Amino acid sequence: MRLPCAILFLITLLSSAPADEGLSKLIVNRVREASVEVLIQGQLRGGGAFVKDSRSRLFVLTAAHLFHTPRDTAIIATHDGRTYFASLSAYDLGHDLALLEVDPVEAAQYGSLKLAASIPNETTPIFNFGPALRRRTLVIPGHVADARISYTDFTSSKGYLAHYFVSGINPVMTSGGIWVNRSGEIVGIQHGRLLAEKGSSGLSMVSSPQAATALIESNTIARTPGLGGYIWEIWTADRALLDELPRNAEGLFVNPVFENGPLARAGIKQFDVIVSCDGIPVRRRHELLAILRSKPAGSSFTFEVVSPGSQGRRPVAFLSEPLEQNWK
């Protein structure tokens, strides 16, 4: 029997319609029960969630920048209004992650959340749970905008945050809050908003589940290779700086250089341009930072550098140092 064209069109349309992208009530309730608010020095700083390692040790996973110093202690508030003491157990400033120790007996009643194996693909719907705008835990939807690892300068660590991008609204106090997929697995931690000229750009910086899992399993202070300054693509420079560089120059200019940091000790000055690292040309910041983070902190590299007003390149020996050693 041949179906009329109109019916065939309707069947095709319905079969291609997107499925409901929301979370089930069961998942929302389970994630809310395992989510917490994090208070430092009596002030609400952001969110977090209960997680377990492979040995069933219980922690709270949150963002490191909620803490003013690693000596701070915290109070966590659960969905039922109870509060519990928590202390910093481990942290990773390169991914802005922190693990908090809590009483495992008291916290066991709230359950814990599993972590996904990897970053979801672009356009995948994911959901942020956190005390946005100082409210009770809200559920804010978003979509993965770029599943590749990006690096953004992060003032709280004076280093770079490795993250992926999520599109959607991102109010204050969402930091430390978890992002979950439709199965309720953690796919990342909220860290901040990429700012536009006026307010938020609508892009969130979210650390990967792989980085969170690594910290949970190691439960140690990370050693993230640091530069001791910030680097920028040369095409973002002011015209005055471009006019002092060789024509068609490519690389990353440095601004600022932090006093007594690795760049300063290597003799690199503000507005110097890093052209290559170990013979590999670097034009975008992720290219250089990926090379630096491919080796342990304390590793040596050779940069090729051009200074404003100079036409020649010079080799510079560079030694990275861990970001975490300067957080006191």
Which role fits each region the language model picked out?
Residues I11, S16-R45:
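Protease-domain processing segments flanking chymotrypsin-fold serine proteases, especially trypsin-like
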Residues R32-L39, D103-S112, L138-M205, P209-Q210, ...:
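Active-site region of chymotrypsin-like
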Residues G42-R45, R55-L138, H163-Y164, M173, ...:
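Conserved active-site neighborhood of the chymotrypsin/trypsin-like protease fold
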Residues F67-H68, I119-N121, V180, I268, ...:
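Short, well-ordered loop/turn sites that connect or cap secondary structure elements
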Residues Y91-H95, A147-Y164, N219-R223, W235-G251:
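Gly/Ser-enriched beta-turn/beta-hairpin loop segments
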Residues T220-S276, I280-E287, I291, V306-P322, ...:
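PDZ/PDZ-like groove recognition
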